[in-house]
């Protein structure tokens, strides 16, 4: 009979090491499962735009107009209406536009109207500011305002207001542009560009952003939550610096807006509506018509653009005055 092999029992040290190893393994497994359950692993990879659509118009906005333009646009047939988002306190910015690219009302016989889009200054609006806005409106008659709070996160409400106003009060405008107060518009170039189009229906253009990723970082201005937008990629859309559309699209987009819950970024929101309507963005052949970022443009370059973003009120006035001079450009 073979002798029995000696059995070596694990020492207390080995048992303690095994115990800690199992504990660490369990903790690691828990952390992995927790990490996999985080929202960035739940992001929907395949974009289905019907996710945003409600069959009933439950998102129709019922804010009231507290100021409207003097001119009866419904009885006019302007070639182009430019709608400029503005904050109630931005009096200098509005005035800079009134004396520069928004001053001239007719280009080669084609009527161009410019209006400013505003919300309320605060829930308890400052009475002095309210009176000054009333006076400003009495003087110029170019302010369109509703009674929602004027904040960055409510820019989408301001855009919905713009589409509603055109649909209800200015339906005969041939083209509509939405832009901001810090954008330099070469109005003459814009009118020329629109006159040279081969088609005037189902047209939407601007600075195109294709396959632009949603930002989940800490910078709040560009952050959007997973709850608000669960996709990694935004739809094709045009930057809010300035997008242009034909009049037939305005009521269609406005109607679609009543079926789509507003999100933080107004330009992306319009892009979602365009995708649901199966409207493609027209990408300009000339890539130098729209400038998204602040760049150092000289007067000759500004004569060739339609819209350039990132200008102060003082710069808009200065560049406009220089552009009007008979400067010879050799390129």
UniProtKB/Swiss-Prot annotation:
- Offer one Pfam family short name for this entry: Galactosyl_T
Functional pathway: Protein modification; protein glycosylation
Give the CC-aspect GO terms: Golgi membrane
Q: Which cell locations does it reside in?
A: Golgi apparatus membrane
Q: How does it sit in the membrane?
A: Single-pass type II membrane protein
EC number(s) recorded for this UniProt protein: 2.4.1.79
Instruction: Report keywords, A-Z.
Output: Glycoprotein, Glycosyltransferase, Golgi apparatus, Lipid metabolism, Magnesium, Membrane, Signal-anchor, Transferase, Transmembrane, Transmembrane helix
Required co-factor(s) are: Mg(2+)
Q: Which InterPro entries match?
A: Glyco_trans_31
* Alphabetized GO MF terms: galactosylgalactosylglucosylceramide beta-D-acetylgalactosaminyltransferase activity; N-acetyl-beta-D-glucosaminide beta-(1,3)-galactosyltransferase activity
Q: What is its main location?
A: Golgi
What are the GO BP annotations of this UniProt entry?
lipid metabolic process; oligosaccharide biosynthetic process; protein O-linked glycosylation
Q: Which residues are glycosylated?
A: 72, 154, 198, 212, 326
Q: Which residues lie on this side of the membrane: Lumenal?
A: 44-331
Q: Which residues cross the membrane?
A: 21-43
Show which residues sit on the Cytoplasmic side of the membrane.
1-20
Q: Which reaction does it catalyse?
A: a globoside Gb3Cer (d18:1(4E)) + UDP-N-acetyl-alpha-D-galactosamine = a globoside Gb4Cer (d18:1(4E)) + UDP + H(+)
Q: What does this protein do?
A: Transfers N-acetylgalactosamine onto globotriaosylceramide. Plays a critical role in preimplantation stage embryonic development.
Q: Which family does it belong to?
A: Belongs to the glycosyltransferase 31 family.
Under PANTHER family, the record lists: BETA-1,3-N-ACETYLGLUCOSAMINYLTRANSFERASE, UDP-GALNAC:BETA-1,3-N-ACETYLGALACTOSAMINYLTRANSFERASE 1
According to UniProt, the name of this protein is: UDP-GalNAc:beta-1,3-N-acetylgalactosaminyltransferase 1
